[in-house]
Regions:
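Intrinsically disordered, low-complexity segments enriched in small/polar residues
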Residues: 2, 6-118
Length: 118
């Protein structure tokens, strides 16, 4: 399986005692525009719904799916395109991160998917 990093950051995967570094591809990173709208109030405090818009992608273009290829994108892009099985993002869940002594993120131990069958 080929991994192509469409983020602007190098992705470091800590797995099986080694570090796999995946540099960004030579393209503009893909960004998703978000919108918020108030859906209710709790004791006068607004409760906002965040909506991710596939129609308002900025930066680079999301490639079409290819056999044996996974694309690393931001979690927001991954969530907005939850119909795409070929999109993954670095798993930044606290149980999946590797940090240095100062708490800085060095990498992750896995990737995550937000794929949902429609």
């Amino acid at each position: 399986m080929k991994l192509i990093n469409l983020t602007k950051h190098q992705v470091n995967l800590f797995t099986n005692g080694e570090i796999i570094s995946i540099p960004p591809a030579d393209c503009d990173p893909i960004r998703i525009t978000t919108h918020q709208r108030e859906i209710s109030r709790v004791d006068g405090i607004p409760v906002m719904q965040t909506v991710y818009s596939q129609s308002e992608v900025t930066g680079g273009r999301l490639p079409d799916p290819k056999p044996n290829t996974m694309y690393i994108v931001s979690s927001l892009v991954c969530m907005a395109y939850s119909d795409r099985r070929d999109l993954v993002s670095p798993n930044t869940h606290p149980d999946a991160t590797v940090r240095d002594g100062m708490g800085n993120l060095m990498g992750v131990t896995s990737l995550q998917s937000f794929y949902r069958r429609n």
